[in-house]
Design a protein with these regions (language model features):
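Short coil/turn motifs at beta-sheet boundaries
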Residues: 147, 195, 356, 391-393
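Short charge-dense sequence patches
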Residues: 32-41, 186, 282, 310-318, ...
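Electropositive phosphate-/nucleotide-binding environments in soluble metabolic enzymes
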Residues: 77-80, 302, 394
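Extracellular "leader-to-stem" segments immediately downstream of a signal peptide or signal-anchor
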Residues: 2-4, 11, 15, 19-20, ...
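Right-handed parallel beta-helix
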Residues: 122-123, 160-169, 208-219, 231-245, ...
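Glycine-rich beta-solenoid repeat tracts in large extracellular/virion proteins
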Residues: 109-112, 125, 129-130, 152-157, ...
Length: 433
């Protein structure tokens, strides 16, 4: 009778076991890789969100070094006209990259055209004029409404495929604007953010397939980055900074007012990855419109499919803020981020004069220190209630998990009959307020 236990030598038997385990591991890993990433509502996330490939500006066409086309390497004169001529020349000749070399170049509002890109070399700086006259009034979008106001330092409208690259700096030169704002507030406490005339740093409207990578975006007089009615915009490894104190001698606690890092206004498919943000207001902010009839205004709109990941926050008012000028935000993810000193991590601003709906928001894998993690309160600043009976606003399907922050106040939530808070979970457990 054959002894079946000895059919295979022990070494061969061990080899079979190892091969079997190896193949099983490969199968399991393949299944894991085959599982597509999803948004909080279960819909599949497009592969575009996993593409962190940096843009090589040398592949984008002819390089237009600004100093080769009449721009002086002189930091004392405003050269808006000369710089704009280089941009327009590049556009007229089929597109290309406007290159800023080492040195400081003072300018007012610049307008990029289809096919043009901006590359700022290490040691190069575009510095904004501190005279508002260098920013001509036009129809633009600001604070949840389309109106006459000032453009940004860098502007693009209706462009497909633009980039801002390089290890250089776009400096808003905001000190005089900040001090003028706080001086106005000292005698008119009710003045709005727009009352003191200030430009933003960058403004993209009606754009798509845009990448902003590696640049330093600092000292904006107003919002730092504002994108409106745009899609498929990537912010990769940017440094975004405005001082949070020490800019106003009568009150040294004051910082750069309303210097939001990235304002996402009625946009879809936005990626913010690997960025550092330290500003004297909110960091990533979702906007879309305000007012009693905001949902009937075609210039407004929702924010959907917004991914913020692997970012580092210094001092900010809110890491991720929905509102106050927001209508409908859906499928929003904040993950794998660290905060040094955020006032709040997730801030849901409930504006009582605006119909709002925030849904399918996930915050996960957050570390560091914050004064408050989740903050939900009515927002009544500049209240503009109109003649309309509004239904309650709503926040639902808000998920928080694997949160490892130090904080004296994890949840600061104020219920109201003006909004409904539903389907909140923390590490999978239901929350009630």
């Amino acid at each position: 009778m054959t002894n079946k236990k000895n059919i295979y030598p022990s070494g061969v038997f061990k080899c079979i076991i190892m091969v079997t385990l190896f193949l099983t591991t490969i199968t399991v890993e393949a299944k894991k890789k085959a599982t597509p990433a999803t948004w909080p509502d279960g819909t599949v996330m497009d592969a575009w969100f996993t593409n962190k490939t940096k843009i090589n500006p040398e592949t984008l066409g002819r390089q237009y070094m600004v100093t080769d086309y009449g721009v002086n390497n002189d930091s004392t004169i405003v050269q808006t006209t000369a710089l704009q001529k280089v941009i327009d020349k590049a556009a007229k000749e089929g597109g290309g990259v406007v290159v800023v070399p080492e040195g400081t170049f003072l300018t007012g509002a610049l307008f990029f055209r289809q096919g043009t890109h901006l590359h700022i070399k290490q040691g190069g700086k575009l510095k904004g004029s501190d005279n508002i006259i260098d920013f001509p009034v036009l129809t633009t979008r600001i604070e949840g409404e389309t109106c006459k106001y000032f453009p940004a330092l860098i502007n693009a409208d209706g462009i497909d495929g633009s980039t801002i690259t390089g290890n250089g700096t776009i400096d808003g030169n905001g000190l005089r604007y900040w001090q003028a704002f706080w001086t106005r507030r000292s005698w008119n406490a009710k003045c709005t953010n727009k009352d003191e005339q200030r430009p933003r740093l960058t403004y993209l409207s009606n754009c798509r397939n845009v990448t902003i990578q590696d640049v330093r975006l600092i000292n904006s007089p107003f919002w730092t980055n504002h994108i409106y009615k745009s899609d498929h915009v990537r912010y990769l490894d940017c440094y975004i900074y405005a001082p949070t104190s020490g800019i106003y001698p009568p009150d040294p606690k004051r910082g750069a007012p309303s210097s939001d890092a990235i304002d996402i206004d009625a946009c879809t498919d936005i990626l913010v990855s690997g960025c550092y943000m330290n500003v004297c207001d909110d960091a990533v902010v979702l906007k879309g419109g305000k007012g009693t009839w905001a949902d009937r205004d075609s210039t407004n709109g929702p924010c959907e499919r917004i991914l913020i990941e692997d970012c580092h926050y210094g001092t900010v008012h809110g890491c991720l803020t929905l509102g106050s000028e927001s209508l409908h935000d859906r499928n929003i993810i904040l993950r794998r981020c660290h905060t040094d000193n955020a006032n709040r991590v997730l801030w849901l601003k409930m504006r009582l004069d605006t119909p709002q709906h925030y849904e399918y928001v996930t915050v996960e894998d957050i570390t560091g220190y914050c004064r408050r993690f989740l903050f939900i309160h009515p927002w009544t600043q500049f209240f503009q209630k109109g003649d309309r009976d509004l239904p309650p606003s709503r926040c639902n399907n808000i998920s928080m998990q694997r949160i490892k922050v130090e904080t004296p106040d994890m949840f600061d939530v104020k219920p109201s009959d003006k909004y409904i808070l539903d389907d909140f979970t923390f590490d999978g457990k239901p929350m009630t307020f």
